[in-house]
Amino acid sequence: LIEILMACKQEGNPDMVFKFCSTSKVSFPGSGVAAIGASKKNIDFIKQQMTIQTIGHDKLNQLRHVRFFKDIHGMVLHMRKHADILRPKFETVLNGLKNELGDLEIGSWLEPRGGYFISFDALPGCAKAIVAKAKEAGLVMTPAGATFPYGKDPQDSNIRIAPSYPTPEELAVAVEIFVLCVKLVSVDKLLEEK
């Protein structure tokens, strides 16, 4: 991936981007340290706004993070631990999708290189029905279209799969249920279109 701030600067548009990040899913959920990256002009603007919005940042929480991570190398080591925990979970889901849906042309997905989600695209008009059918079977998922503004997916096709919480064993069962729901809803959709 290109570094977007540098790319915008090189193209003469340094003020187009604000980058936000947080350690919220890395360290303490809901208590992470956040950061903003932007051009000097945009950072100056943000500082003006924040001056009147906050008395001061949670310095004890910042200190807690510095003591825990120490430096960028500590952050990298910690993220490798996260990857070691998440990798088998993602592999379980991705292998299930590939083995059960790979050649059927009723869904596609992105294999993420980081992050906490797998983006699955069903046939248009099927995502809400798939999530509803999964819920009937006891599998609770992120609402269909959650990746779109206001949750309104114009194609009703996107489902965000979040494999980080369940165990790999629970995920194996969840994937079986999910792919079965994808197949059932897709068959209904294809028969409806004939």
Predicted regions mapped to residue ranges:
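Short beta-strand segments
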Residues: 21, 35-37, 110-111, 117-121, ...
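Conserved PLP phosphate-binding loop immediately N-terminal to the Schiff-base lysine helix
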Residues: 1-4
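Short, solvent-exposed loop/turn elements at beta->coil junctions and helix N-caps
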Residues: 21-24, 106-107, 145-150
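Conserved C-terminal alpha-helix-loop-beta "cap" of PLP-dependent enzymes
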Residues: 43, 47, 53, 117-160, ...
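PLP-dependent enzyme catalytic core of the Aspartate aminotransferase-like
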Residues: 13, 136, 152-194
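Conserved core segment of the aminotransferase class I/II
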Residues: 6-87
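Short, conserved active-site loop motifs that form the nucleotide-linked donor/cofactor pocket
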Residues: 17, 107, 139
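Conserved glycine-rich beta-strand-loop-beta hairpin in the small C-terminal domain of fold type I
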Residues: 80-94, 106-121
